[in-house]
Amino acid sequence: MAEKGQKSLAVNKKARFDYLIEDTFEAGMVLVGTEVKSIRQGKINIKEGYARIENSEIYLHNVHISPYEQGNIFNKDPLRIRKLLLHKAEIRKLIGYVQQKGYTLVPMKVYLQNGLVKLQLGVGVGKKLHDKRQDMAKKDSQRRIQKELGQRQKGME
């Protein structure tokens, strides 16, 4: 589902499994040149990442961007805290979400859009174990139905 001029670099598939995502936002990231080069090579891990609101600004924590190989002294700490760029209205909306009990800001996807590194930030509530099991059972039954339909259509031909 990549839009025109958009190249996906990292996807957090586990986020939809662990969280019930209610809304998503597109945010820019404040990066150093060597970090951008490393991200373009796909050397970013957002699985353990999360975002926090501090002083009406949003910061991305625990996202690992591997050091750029030719970066030498210009490389920064791979796990440093990075500021996210959003409009004030979006930040206010996110503050409203996070003040409600149980809501978390989760990085969903990192992609290039017209040469700029963007982050899709999801707002979600953590799923309980029984919710995860229910989702897995639903997906499994859908897979079985599709398999049966495929076999029936092959038999008709």
Curated annotation (Swiss-Prot):
Chain positions covered by the region annotation Disordered: 130-157
GO CC entries: cytosol
Keyword field: Cytoplasm, RNA-binding
UniProt GO molecular function: RNA binding
Biased composition range(s): Basic and acidic residues: 132-157
Cell compartment(s), UniProt: Cytoplasm
Short name of one Pfam family: SmpB
Domain of life per record: Bacteria
Keyword Amino-acid biosynthesis: no
InterPro entries on file: SmpB, SsrA-bd_prot, SsrA-bd_prot_CS
GO biological processes: trans-translation
Physiological role: Required for rescue of stalled ribosomes mediated by trans-translation. Binds to transfer-messenger RNA (tmRNA), required for stable association of tmRNA with ribosomes. tmRNA and SmpB together mimic tRNA shape, replacing the anticodon stem-loop with SmpB. tmRNA is encoded by the ssrA gene; the 2 termini fold to resemble tRNA(Ala) and it encodes a 'tag peptide', a short internal open reading frame. During trans-translation Ala-aminoacylated tmRNA acts like a tRNA, entering the A-site of stalled ribosomes, displacing the stalled mRNA.
HAMAP family: SmpB (MF_00023)
Family: Belongs to the SmpB family.
Protein's name according to its UniProt entry: SsrA-binding protein
Organism: Alkaliphilus metalliredigens (strain QYMF)
Gene: smpB
